[in-house]
């Protein structure tokens, strides 16, 4: 087997006789040949070929590796026909570092000799490995562990040589590539596209042609890789990835150069056969309408949503109409709806607690009483009822203030503040009559008559309600002064309170009956459940008893079968023992008759036979007893 370590390195001839000569070595001459063969790197056709630099660079590195080995055709064939992409990428990384290291300035004679040996050994390893699926240039495995170790040693020597030559500067190889080949490639592209002079192109800086953010990301990526190499050491993979990053640098110029081309085309339009007009043209005078400014139309939007108006100029709030208009159709409405309409029309004059009180009363009172209350509510004096406070200065409510406590006690009245509230028993007190309501103004007789008739209607409705409900009711004092009829708030409050108490009693009565019926239903349900449960238990007991009987029957049958089997086995054993005993008896008889003298001399044997006989006999007796017991069972 061919040993890779003993491979003879190819000879690289030097034109100079000393290591300090400035002549190019054969390695560098091969690099020059590769440069001359790839003319596209010097004069690219268009800006669109900038992204081809990385591909060209990789191909150039592979060509250098294959041509330096002396077995270019064999290596190229193996590499091209291999299907192991992982192994091919490892070889490409090795060639990138090798090419960049040879391209460095100041490479001395000893370093070049070391590179020659590295190239020779690496090439022989590729030929021996064949770059198959289990290649040593791929992941480690038990099959390729020897070649894999050789490959790691060669790569380690190349990385160590790169570290020595660059004095530990991790980005030195990439920076050399950026300043030489990448810079020349970019300037040649600019020269070909923009048609600039060589002096102008030479004065350009790469940082001026690259987007600032792109250049910042480019530098940050390389610095991060430098930190990785400094912390974990030089390696072929890390060095090669930095070189690949530098190789894609021309792609950062794509957008910038395209913008420059567009600016040039816009500033210098190409017109076939037409001369370019001079920039300073004479003024031809004012242009009609030049100073007129076209006003842009203002767009206003308008959205109408639930009686609200939103406009980009005006904001209109909801409009409330506080006026009240008589409508004869209101008489056909229900008392509750009439009250709600009244509250909505007089929302600014009635306080919230007062409106809630009217709604509560009209909702709980019977229809006849609510009609009467609603009639008073529709009267124009309602606002005065809820908002008026008696004052001695105008004479209104003076009768209430002058009422003595003795009169209140005599009339069985309750006092809430300064307004009296008379409470009488419906069974002992005659119905209310409006005759007690008088007017203090003789000039308003018509108004007094209408008020009296209205009071009469209220009294009749309340008396009708008292006759239907056997309970205490309220009787209200109506005061008529200056033609206005007042309905005290205490009347409405006490009326609603009374009706509420009646409804509470009715609800409690209904609840009592409902509770009694519910208890009866619960008792019936318990009885039904109890009977159903007992029936189910009896059925379960019957089924269980039948199952037990069946189980006992089956168990007894199984027991009988087992006992019969035991009996048969015991019977067989007993017969066998009987045969043994008979043989022992025969043997003993023969011994006794044939040779008595010998038996006397063999007392020990006879005694032993007797013991065996007794033991067998005891066993037979025991088995006989067992058989008898089994027969009895």
Swiss-Prot record:
Disruption outcome: Cells are still able to induce low levels of internalization, but are impaired in their ability to enter epithelial cells.
Localization, UniProt: Secreted
Coiled coil: none
Predominant location category: secreted
GO molecular-function term, one example from the UniProt record: actin binding
Keyword Secreted: yes
Comp. bias regions, Low complexity: 438-455
Membership in a protein family: Belongs to the SipA/IpaA family.
SUBUNIT field: The association of the vinculin-IpaA complex with actin occurs via the F-actin binding domain located on the tail of vinculin.
Protein name according to UniProt: Invasin IpaA
Source species of the chain: Shigella flexneri
Encoding gene per record: ipaA
């Amino acid at each position: 087997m061919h040993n890779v370590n003993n491979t003879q390195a190819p000879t690289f001839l030097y034109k100079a006789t000393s290591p300090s000569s400035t002549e190019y070595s054969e390695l560098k001459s091969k690099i020059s040949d590769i440069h001359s063969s790839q003319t596209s790197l010097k004069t690219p056709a268009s800006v669109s070929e900038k992204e081809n630099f990385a591909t060209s660079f990789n191909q150039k590195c592979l060509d250098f590796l294959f041509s330096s080995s002396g077995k270019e055709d064999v290596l190229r064939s193996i590499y091209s026909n291999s299907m192991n992409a992982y192994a091919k990428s490892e070889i490409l990384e090795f060639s990138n570092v090798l090419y960049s290291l040879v391209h460095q300035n100041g490479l001395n004679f000893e370093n070049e000799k070391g590179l020659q040996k590295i190239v020779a050994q690496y090439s022989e390893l590729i030929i021996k490995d064949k770059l198959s699926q289990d290649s040593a240039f791929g992941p480690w495995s038990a099959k390729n562990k020897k070649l894999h170790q050789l490959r790691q040693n060669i790569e380690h020597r190349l990385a160590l040589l790169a570290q020595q030559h660059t004095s530990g500067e991790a980005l030195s190889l990439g920076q050399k590539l950026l300043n030489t080949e990448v810079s020349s490639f970019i300037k040649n592209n600019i020269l070909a596209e923009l048609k600039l002079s060589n002096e102008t192109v030479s004065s350009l800086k790469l940082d001026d042609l690259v987007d600032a953010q792109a250049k910042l990301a480019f530098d940050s990526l390389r610095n991060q890789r430098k930190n990785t190499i400094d912390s974990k050491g030089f390696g072929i993979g890390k060095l090669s990835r930095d070189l690949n990053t530098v190789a894609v640098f021309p792609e950062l110029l794509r957008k910038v150069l395209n913008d420059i081309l567009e600016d040039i085309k816009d500033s210098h339009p190409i017109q076939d056969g037409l001369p370019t007009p001079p920039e300073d043209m004479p003024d031809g005078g004012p242009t009609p309408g030049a100073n007129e400014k076209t006003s842009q139309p203002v767009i206003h939007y308008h959205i109408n949503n639930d009686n609200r108006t939103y406009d980009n100029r005006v904001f209109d709030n909801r409009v409330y109409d506080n006026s009240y208009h008589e409508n004869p159709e209101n008489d056909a409405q229900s008392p509750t709806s009439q009250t709600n309409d009244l509250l909505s029309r007089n929302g600014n004059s009635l306080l919230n607690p007062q409106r809630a009180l009217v709604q509560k009363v009209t909702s709980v009172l019977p229809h006849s009483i609510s009609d009467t209350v609603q009639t008073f509510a529709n009267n124009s004096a309602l606002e005065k009822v809820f908002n008026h406070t008696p004052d001695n200065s105008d004479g209104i409510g003076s009768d209430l203030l002058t009422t003595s406590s003795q009169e209140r006690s005599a009339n069985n009245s309750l006092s809430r503040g300064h307004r009296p509230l008379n409470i009488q028993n419906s069974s002992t007190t005659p119905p209310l009559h409006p005759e007690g309501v008088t007017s203090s103004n003789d000039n308003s007789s018509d108004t007094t008559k209408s008020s009296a008739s209205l009071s009469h209607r209220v009294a009749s409705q309340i008396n009708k309600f008292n006759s239907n409900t056997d309970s205490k009711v309220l009787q209200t004092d109506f005061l008529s002064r200056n033609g206005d009829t007042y309905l005290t708030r205490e009347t409405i409050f006490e009326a609603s309170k009374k009706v509420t108490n009646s409804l509470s009693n009715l609800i409690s009565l209904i609840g009592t009956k409902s509770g009694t019926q519910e208890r009866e239903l619960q008792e019936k349900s318990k009885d039904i459940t109890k009977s159903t449960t007992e029936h189910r238990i009896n059925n379960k007991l019957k089924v269980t008893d039948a199952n037990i009987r069946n189980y006992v029957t089956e168990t007894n049958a199984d027991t009988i079968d087992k006992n019969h089997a035991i009996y048969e086995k015991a019977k067989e054993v007993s017969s066998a023992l009987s045969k043994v005993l008979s043989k022992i008896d025969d043997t003993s008889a023969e011994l006794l008759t044939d040779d008595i003298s010998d038996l006397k001399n063999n007392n020990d044997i006879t005694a032993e036979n007797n013991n065996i006989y007794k033991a067998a006999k005891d066993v037979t007796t025991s088995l006989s007893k067992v058989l008898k017991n089994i027969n009895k069972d």
